[in-house]
A protein has these predicted regions:
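A beta-strand edge to alpha-helix "cap/lid" segment located at domain peripheries
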Residues: 2-30, 40-137
Length: 137
């Protein structure tokens, strides 16, 4: 499906890229820029879920304590499925620094990312964000 300014997939990829770049720079307003006000996020550290922009904003305080602007926050293996009004994207995120194979306290780590997006008046907005790591059992 072609939209003004490119395909839905290319526009969503640009939104996700801008979000990841804002995370790397610790730019909170850039992080929030493409999110809906009633965002729902499921994250790895508590709380189990964050509902609404105010709660979502608070989650970044903890992240910024451990992630330095010079460290990785790289989107890999991005796959986007887009319809006219809704889309989802899945990816692996490389976060931090170090080996990326050990626990977070050893440096970098990988996590799974799932995003749910809605097309609102021609702009793709993130309505749901889910971060997860596999069980280590």
């Amino acid at each position: 499906m072609m939209e003004q300014g490119g395909t839905a997939e290319s526009r969503i990829k640009a939104v996700i890229g801008a979000w990841a770049d804002a995370v790397r720079r610790h730019d909170l307003s850039g992080i929030l820029a493409h999110h809906e006000q009633d965002i729902v996020m499921f994250d790895v550290p508590p709380p189990l879920q964050s509902r609404g922009m105010d709660e979502y904003k608070k989650t970044w305080d903890l992240f910024f304590r451990y992630h330095k602007p010079s460290q990785a926050f790289d989107i890999e293996e991005l796959a986007i499925t887009a319809g006219e009004d809704v889309a989802f994207a899945v990816a692996i995120v490389r976060c931090g620094s170090g080996t990326f194979s050990g626990p977070p306290e050893e440096g970098g780590f990988l996590f799974r990312l799932t995003l749910g997006l809605r097309n609102i008046d021609g702009d793709w907005c993130i309505a749901h964000e889910h971060h997860s790591v596999p069980s280590t059992d």
